[in-house]
Amino acid sequence: MYSISFAPLQGYTEDVYRRIHQDVFGGVDTYYTPFVRLEHGEVRSKDMRDVRPEFNQGVNVIPQVIANGGNELQQLVDKLTGLNYKRIDINMGCPFPLQTRHGRGAGLLPDVEAVKEIVGVMKENLGVEFSVKMRLGLEDENEWKEIIPLLNNVPLNHITVHPRIATQQYKGEVKMSAFDELLEACQHEVIFNGDITSVDDIKRIEDTYGDKLQGIMIGRGMLGRPSLAMEYKSGKQMADAEVVRRLKVMHDRMWQHYEQIIPGEAQRLAKIRTFWDYTEAILGRKAWKKVMKAGNLKNYLKAVQEL
């Protein structure tokens, strides 16, 4: 049976979501934080709050970082090791231009010299166990061919691969033939990521690759059906009505949390509504639209109650 990781998703899988998901659904072996990054030369305080140990107690959390080279990475490593983290994941896969145009995320993949710097930092920090999340390339699905040999020369826990190029973002087909080629070339454990939305999808990967893979990382598919990891681990499908019931439990606990920390009704509503972004399939279009289109807090909470 594969290990199941919950992918880091900016704006969704913050500390409160991770804690409550584990309590209400479970089945996830490892949760990754949305990437910690520098802003104006300093580590973002918002990102550091999300990884603080007191907000992640009882949850197996690995912080992810995003950097454009060795100097940025070392700053981030210093901050996280200061919080006693021994595992750090490095993002070489973020497809969004806000990061890639600054040489971060998948923007690293065509920049062999920057990756060499990152490898150097990993070698210098032997007390940290690193992993990497990457795509096949920024604009070319062959860019990984210069990167994997560099990563083969440094100890890594694993490499997570999303077999698309960054310019696809999440559209188009995953490039499985290129993934197969990468898998053969990689000397580390590999985790598969991309387009996993059902237990059948997990089993299809499992049947194809068996013990060639360490596990599966799921992102948007888990936001849409948070029972997915538990269903795979237990071998039992949860009834849709029970998934929705537990979604409402999750939602209500998150809402209570936001009431305490977010001033202003409009701000709280804008924040909590994103909880439902990927749930149209499980809720049904009519009910989902009612939640997403509610114009004020009273109508929103009524729409949620009626789910």
Per-region residue spans from a language model:
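Flavin-dependent oxidoreductase catalytic cores
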Residues: M1-L307
